[in-house]
C-alpha cells in the first residue's frame, strides 16, 4: 500500500441520491498514484463507514506534481449504491472488494 494523504476539498449531501459526494485531493509526492481500492479504504477509514459503501468515481493525476484529484460517493446503504452507480464503476468497486477479501484471508 502506498503512502498518501487525503484532503477533502468539498463535501456535499445529495438528498435525491441519498449519498455524500466528496471532492478530494490525494497528495503522494514521490509515490505512485494510489489505486481506487486504496482510496476507498482510506476514505472509509476517515469517515468511519463501511468500505463497501464508498465508491471512487474519478481519479485524475496531475503530471509531475504528486497530486491526484478524486471524486468519491459515500452511500447510506448498499442497495442505493447498486441502483445508482454505472455498471463500470460497480464492476471496479466489486473487484476492489474481492481483492481486499482475498488479502484478508
From Swiss-Prot:
Q: Which organism is it from?
A: Ignicoccus hospitalis (strain KIN4/I / DSM 18386 / JCM 14125)
Q: Does the keyword Ribonucleoprotein apply?
A: yes
- Indicate what this protein is called per its UniProt record: Small ribosomal subunit protein eS24
Origin: domain of life: Archaea
Homology family: Belongs to the eukaryotic ribosomal protein eS24 family.
The processes (GO biological process) annotated in the record are: translation
Q: Which PROSITE patterns match?
A: RIBOSOMAL_S24E
Where in the sequence is the signal peptide annotated? none
Specify whether Cytoplasm is a keyword of the entry. Answer: no
> Its Gene Ontology molecular function terms?
structural constituent of ribosome
Keyword annotations of the record: Ribonucleoprotein, Ribosomal protein
Cellular component GO terms, alphabetically? ribonucleoprotein complex; ribosome
Amino acid at each position: 500500500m502506498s503512502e498518501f494523504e487525503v484532503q477533502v476539498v468539498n463535501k456535499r449531501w445529495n438528498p435525491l441520491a441519498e449519498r455524500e459526494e466528496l471532492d478530494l485531493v490525494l497528495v503522494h509526492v514521490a509515490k505512485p498514484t494510489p489505486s481506487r481500492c486504496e482510496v476507498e479504504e482510506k476514505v472509509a477509514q476517515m469517515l468511519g463507514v463501511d468500505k463497501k459503501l464508498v465508491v471512487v468515481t474519478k481519479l485524475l493525476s496531475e503530471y509531475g506534481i504528486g497530486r491526484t484529484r478524486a471524486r468519491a460517493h459515500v452511500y447510506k446503504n448498499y442497495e442505493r449504491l447498486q441502483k445508482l452507480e454505472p455498471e463500470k464503476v460497480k464492476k471496479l468497486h466489486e473487484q476492489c472488494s474481492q481483492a481486499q477479501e482475498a488479502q484478508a484471508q
